[in-house]
Amino acid sequence: MPEYLSVSTLTKYLKMKFERDPYLERVYLTGQVSNFRRRPNHQYFSLKDEKAVIQVTIWSGVYQKLGFELEEGMKINVIGRVQLYEPSGSYSIIIEKAEPDGIGALAIQFEQLKKKLGEEGLFQDKFKQSLPQFPKKIGVVTSPSGAVIRDIITTVSRRFPGVEIVLYPTKVQGDGAAAQIADHIRLANERSDLDVLIIGRGGGSIEDLWAFNEEETVRAIFESRIPVISSVGHETDTTLADFAADRRAATPTAAAELATPVTKLDLLGHLQQQENRMSRAISNRLSYYRERLNKLTQSVIFRQPERLYDGHLQKLDQLNLRLKQKIREYYSEEKQRVKILQHRLEALNPHSRVQRLQEQTAQLERLLRSNMAVIYDNKVAQVRRLSEALLMLDTSRIVARGYAIVQKNQKVIESSAGIEEKDELTLLMRDGQLEVEVKHVQRKEI
């Protein structure tokens, strides 16, 4: 007669077989994530393909070390063990390790972190800072022994000698590298004299470059008040640090060139151009004023200076007439005032007082006449002197006295200096002018 087993007995037997079977102690599965809903601690979901579904469990400690976020429909490769749950008689896979199928976990983590930080605005162009044209000090966050720092020093020294490089020796890969990079970026920002900051390292695998994809590094770059140039890996490598930096350089040499956009030779050439422009401007200005001076010397005032006084002579005549008119008016007013006083005196009547006042009035009248005559004579003499002074400047008066005025090319000649034999001169005389040719020049020592 057959022996019937209880459900629990069979379940325990199957569990023992699962646990002792070497093929089930460590299984390698590939499948698509299904029914995933993230929970605070342990994660429970399904792994399926076209024909079957298996329940899987990831304990919280393992899930936190995955390095990427599980998503519904994601195809993953897992390593785990089979476990049977006795109360329900169901089995599941306890995952010990997982990674995306076809693409590494780091690549998934890269895209997920890129999306997260991008949505926060860390990569937007509006936050990018411009690089200085003439830096005095350049900070470098990199390994002290790699080729990066040597290339940067060589390039900067060649392009603009005298620029100081401040090195922050930094671990650029492995555990703790991201934290040290971020710390040194913040340390550099404590200085007020750094103009630009270069962070970078040489080429390597995605694992080697991963410190520059860490969130801590990216946020430190974004928060830097000093403009940051990222130079990580080779030209084909791209890190999140490149997106957050103000500028990205393909090589350390290119980073040094970005940090020194103007070379010493460029600056010297620019200064030479400015000097040439200034020289041309000064030369043009001198030519302009020289031309103006030539025009002035050919003007009527210089060729006929007597015209300069015509207006003044006319004004002097007008002033003379006004002066005479004022004297006459003043004399008439005073005379009228005296008459008024005489009438008042006559109206007061004692005779003696009237007589005394009449005498005083007569004396004042004589004094007034005398003063008016003196004033008039003085003004007339002053006008005469001014007229004679102006007449002395009149060339027609000079030639009227028997002198001649010598001109060369319509310019008055005051000395024999500058006169050579066969020069043609013009002699202005009282009744005409003579055109003469110099036959001999005899100069006197003065």
Curated annotation (Swiss-Prot):
Its EC number is 3.1.11.6. GO terms for cellular component: cytoplasm; exodeoxyribonuclease VII complex. GO terms for molecular function: exodeoxyribonuclease VII activity; nucleic acid binding. InterPro entries: Exonuc_VII_L, Exonuc_VII_lsu_C, OB-fold_nuc-bd_dom. It catalyses: Exonucleolytic cleavage in either 5'- to 3'- or 3'- to 5'-direction to yield nucleoside 5'-phosphates. The keyword Cytoplasm applies. It is an enzyme of class 3 (hydrolase). Signal peptide: none annotated. Pfam families: Exonuc_VII_L, tRNA_anti_2. It is found in: Cytoplasm. Keywords: Cytoplasm, Exonuclease, Hydrolase, Nuclease. GO terms for biological process: DNA catabolic process. CDD domains: ExoVII_LU_OBF (cd04489). It comes from the Bacteria. Heterooligomer composed of large and small subunits. Bidirectionally degrades single-stranded DNA into large acid-insoluble oligonucleotides, which are then degraded further into small acid-soluble oligonucleotides. Belongs to the XseA family. This is Exodeoxyribonuclease 7 large subunit. The lineage of its organism: Bacteria, Bacillati, Bacillota, Bacilli, Lactobacillales. The gene is xseA.
